[in-house]
Amino acid sequence: MNSTFIKPQFKRNLNPKIGLIALATDFMIERDFNKVTKGMNIDLFVNRIHCHFPLTSENLIKMSNTVTEVSKDILPNEKLNCIVYGCTSGTIVAGYDSIKKKIKLAKPDAEVTTPSTAAINALKKMNISKISIFTPYSKKLNDQVVDYFKKENFVVTSNSYFDISNDSDIAKIDQNYLYETLLKMDLGDAEALFLSC
C-alpha cells in the first residue's frame, strides 16, 4: 500500500467568527440571530449558559458567574471577532463592565456586545431620547430595566410589563397577543419602543 503525504492548503480569508452565549432556556435567539444576519458573511457559534429560576437579580448575577467558562467553550483556543451575551436583563443587573471582563478572561481579543448595550448605542445613534419600555419580567426586574435606561439619560414616557418569572415561559407568549398588547400601549410622546426579551 502506498501512503502519500499531501500538503494541506488552508483558507486565506475566513469569515468573521461571532460567539453567542444563549440562555439554556431560550427558544428563540438562534433563529432570531440568523434572521438578522441572513446574507452576511459571518459564522455563528453558540454555547448555552445555565439559567436559574425565578428571574431575579440574585439569580441573574449567579448565572453571570459562569460567563468565562461558557465563553472558553466557544471554539476553544480559537480567536473570535465578537461575543454576544444574549441576556438583556442579565447584563443590566450584573453590569456590562462585569460581563465584558468575564468574557475577556476567556477571549481577550473578542469585542463584546449585549442586547441592552446594542440598544443603547442604536438609540443614541438615531438621536432618540424619549422611549417607552415593555418587558416580560417581574415588577422588580422591570423597574431595574427602566432605571438602567434613565441612567443612560433616556426619558421613559411609559412602561408596561407581563410579570413573568420563568424564562421558559417568556418564549411561549402568543405572538399575536403580544402584538395586540404593544399596539394598545400608551406610548406618550415616545420616539421609540424598547421591547426587552
Regions found by a protein language model. Give the residues of each.
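General beta-strand structural signal in soluble alpha/beta enzymes
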Residues: 84-85, 111-115, 158-159, 194-195
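Short, charged beta->alpha transition segments
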Residues: 68-74, 116-121, 145
